Amino acid sequence: MITIDNLHKSFDGVEVLKGASLEVRDGDVVALIGPSGEGKSVFLKHVSGLLKPDSGRIFFNGKDLCGLRRSELVALRSRFGFLFQNGALFDSMTVYDNVAFPLREKTRLSEKQIRERVLAELEQVGLAEAEDKYPAQLSGGMAKRAALARALIRAPEIMLFDEPTTGLDPIIVHSIHELIDSTHKRLGFSGILVSHEIPEVFAFVQKVAFLHEGVIRFVGTPKEIFETDDTVVRDFIRGSLPSEALRFREQVPFQLNVNEARGGVA
C-alpha cells in the first residue's frame, strides 16, 4: 500500500502542493486527473522519490520514504517501474538493449537468462519482431510499448505512469490503455496514472483522484466521479468529455464501456 500524507511543495516561493493526500491500495491503479499545471507530475515525482516534499510523508508498506537514507531509497526504487511522457528510450540502443538495460545494470542474471526475459516481455507488448530496431525507427505507439516493456522487465510492485499516451492518435491511445490494463491484470502491480484521457482511463482503473489547487479534492471510483455533487469536479469532467459522450451520459446510466461514450471509436 502507498500512503501519501499531507504533501507540501513550493518552487521559488510558489506553492504547488498544499497538503495533497492519497492512498493507493495493493493491486489498485489510481488515475490522477486535474487541470494542466496543477502539479500532477510533481506529485508523481514525490511518490517515486525523485523529489522531496517541504513537509508531509510518503509511506510504502508502512516505510516512510522521506526518512530513508539514499542507499535505502535506491534499493526501494528497484521495486518501482516508471513510464514517462516521452518514453525515455536510449537512442543509441536497440529495442532489445533498452529493455535489457535494467537487468544488466541491476541484476546478476546471465545473458541467456536476460535474453529469455527480454524476448518474453517483447512478446507480451507486441514487439517480438522489433528487437533489433532503434527508437528512431519506431512509431509513437511502438516506442511507448518498448518503454513499457523496459519498465515491466523487473516485475515492479508499483508502476507510475506520467501521461503515457501524450501525443498519440486516438486509436493508439486506446491500444496503449488496453496494454496497460492487460499488464496490470497479468502482474498485479499497484499504480498511479497521470492522464488527461477522460473518460478512456476510467475503463480500467479502480479509483480516480482529482488534484485541484494543490490538494486531492476527490477520490472515488469512476462511477462515483460522475455522480459527485462537487461542482468543481463535475465541471472539469464535463469540460473534458466530447459532445457525443455528454449526450451519452444524459441518456443512459454510467457504465465502463467508454468506447460507446466515444461513439464507437476504438
Regions found by a protein language model. Name each.
Residues 201-203:
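A short, surface-exposed alpha-helical micro-motif characterized by mixed small hydrophobic
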Residues 159-162:
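Catalytic Walker B motif of ABC-type/P-loop ATPase nucleotide-binding domains
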